[in-house]
């Protein structure tokens, strides 16, 4: 009977049985369940993730004797294993030993939020494990909130959003990689012993060279419409790292979160460090089933107007590149309208005063209309679009500048630059990245968008571009002890602008 129970729950999903004396935390959607085990003053354990459990299933899992893993592994007292969280306390101690101090579930209209609070057994160091279960789309978001009340800063060396054990078998991994003009190439491979790492160090973008999303096919080579699948997508636009450790145990160990490389974070007393959400889904309808769950989740909860059809558009870039002029824009709008299109987007090349934007070497940062190219301005083009029965969109790249620009001449200190080093330049040999960790830069970027939308409220679409990575590690705004915060501060600033 015991072997039959083990087989049953292996088929259902991923699980770790524990003693029935433990208290269970069951987090469910319409068709999936995540099961954890906890006790006051004990360690939080992971039991299961997969197809939705009945009460009888839960009882069978917790009553079956087997090994288990921490739901959020921490470093220091189990050093050979990978960890989700690694810190250095103010006194130099690099160990953690977390115990459960509380569990709270808040029921919302279409999602339930479960927060499990942990505290170190000795230090006033706290972690909240948060799970938001969207009932109607079968997605669970997982993230952490880290804080402390020690007298001095605590160093966060590693700070994953979540950890998920996946039981070994014939497990295959599907992921996406690529390059410019060669994006989203699918690679599928069996998980073998060792460490598989997918990460991004671009600094600005959640790179097209590798994606922060994977799918685990639990029944062998991936199939589109059949087989058990676990999908994971990290909701973060910056540097990320996905790790899959296949060790000598019975499980593949999956960790996902911000890429901690060169990003040690000095956490102040009372400050809360929130990690990005890891979205998890399960389906027994193959890769397509997992994809459909993610699509429903994104359209319903993450995308503006996610339930609306996207407009058919014409973009000016491939047609004229930087050679924008009023007559050309009018002709392109007439052309897309005559073909039944719904939107025209004027791309790069419409701005610049002292330095008109005629090539990629000048003008980024100077977001005023080039009146020589567009005598009637943006407003005149919007009027033409209305007469043609289409909407109007515009291109910007407000987080960037060129060294040949009025903005750079006024604010060279706004640029991400290593002290005592010459600038490493990007596109056109003059492009630089603005330091979005600086509140003044955040205000500038916000105002670029705000002024466009205030002056031209009928703009229907903004193409926000990003054509450069962070090539120089250094911030004029951050203090000398906070230089390792650069990547995190940049994306916090971007998120602040977009709120």
Language-model features and meaning:
Residues 316-409, 443-447, 488-498:
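Aromatic- and glycine-enriched glycan-recognition loops and surfaces
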Residues 31, 87-88, 95-100, 265-284:
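Short Pro-Gly-centered flexible turn/kink motifs
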Residues 69-99, 216-243, 282-303, 341-348, ...:
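Glycine-rich, aromatic-flanked loop segments that form ligand/cofactor-binding clefts
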Residues 27-38, 44-51, 66-68, 77, ...:
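N-terminal structural segment of carbohydrate-active enzymes
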Residues 31, 144, 270, 314, ...:
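Conserved, mostly hydrophobic/aromatic
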Residues 22-35, 42-245, 261:
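Polysaccharide-binding surfaces and accessory modules of carbohydrate-active proteins
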Residues 370-377, 383-387, 409-499:
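Active-site neighborhood of glycoside hydrolase catalytic domains
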């Amino acid at each position: 009977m015991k072997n039959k129970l083990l087989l049953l729950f292996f088929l259902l999903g991923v699980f770790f049985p524990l003693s029935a004396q433990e208290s269970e935390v069951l987090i469910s959607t319409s068709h999936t369940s995540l099961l954890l085990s906890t006790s006051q003053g004990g360690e939080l354990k992971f039991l299961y993730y997969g197809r939705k459990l009945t009460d009888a299933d839960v009882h069978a899992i917790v009553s079956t004797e087997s090994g288990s893993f921490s739901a959020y592994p921490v470093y220091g007292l189990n050093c050979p294993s990978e960890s989700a969280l690694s810190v250095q306390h103010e006194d130099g101690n690099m160990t953690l030993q977390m115990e459960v101090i509380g569990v709270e579930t808040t029921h919302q209209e279409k999602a339930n939020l479960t927060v499990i609070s942990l505290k170190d057994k000795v230090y006033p160091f706290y972690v909240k494990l948060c799970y938001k279960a969207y009932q109607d789309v079968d997605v669970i978001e997982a993230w952490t909130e880290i804080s402390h009340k020690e007298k001095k800063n605590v160093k966060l060396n590693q700070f994953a959003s979540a950890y998920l054990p996946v039981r070994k078998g014939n497990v295959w991994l599907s992921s996406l990689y690529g390059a410019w003009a060669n994006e989203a190439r699918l690679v599928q491979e069996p998980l073998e012993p060792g460490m598989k790492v997918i990460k991004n160090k671009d600094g600005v973008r959640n790179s097209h060279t590798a994606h922060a999303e994977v799918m685990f096919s639990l029944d062998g080579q991936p199939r589109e419409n059949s087989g058990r699948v676990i999908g994971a997508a990290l909701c973060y636009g910056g540097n990320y790292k996905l790790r899959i450790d296949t060790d000598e145990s019975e499980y593949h160990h999956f960790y996902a979160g911000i890429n901690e490389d060169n990003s040690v974070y000095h956490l102040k007393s009372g400050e809360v460090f929130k990690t990005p959400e890891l979205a998890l889904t399960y389906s027994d309808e193959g890769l397509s089933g997992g994809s459909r769950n993610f699509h429903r989740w994104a359209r319903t909860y993450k995308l503006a107007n996610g339930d609306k059809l996207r407009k058919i558009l014409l973009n000016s870039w491939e047609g004229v590149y930087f050679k924008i002029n009023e007559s050309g824009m009018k002709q392109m709008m007439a052309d897309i309208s005559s073909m039944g299109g719904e939107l025209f987007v004027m791309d790069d090349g419409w701005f610049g005063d002292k330095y008109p934007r005629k090539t990629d070497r000048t003008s980024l940062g100077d977001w005023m209309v080039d009146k020589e190219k567009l005598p009637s301005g943006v407003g005149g083009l919007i009027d033409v679009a209305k007469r043609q029965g289409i909407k109007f969109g515009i291109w910007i790249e407000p987080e960037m500048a060129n060294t040949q620009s009025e903005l750079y001449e006024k604010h060279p200190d706004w640029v991400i630059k290593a002290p005592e080093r010459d600038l490493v330049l990007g596109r056109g040999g003059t492009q630089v990245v603005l330091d979005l960790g600086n509140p003044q830069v955040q205000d500038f970027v916000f105002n670029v968008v705000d002024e466009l939308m205030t002056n031209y409220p009928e703009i229907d679409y903004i193409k926000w571009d990003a054509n450069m990575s962070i090539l120089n590690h250094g911030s004029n705004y951050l203090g000398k002890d906070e230089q390792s915060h650069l990547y995190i501060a940049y994306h916090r600033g971007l998120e602040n602008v977009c709120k």
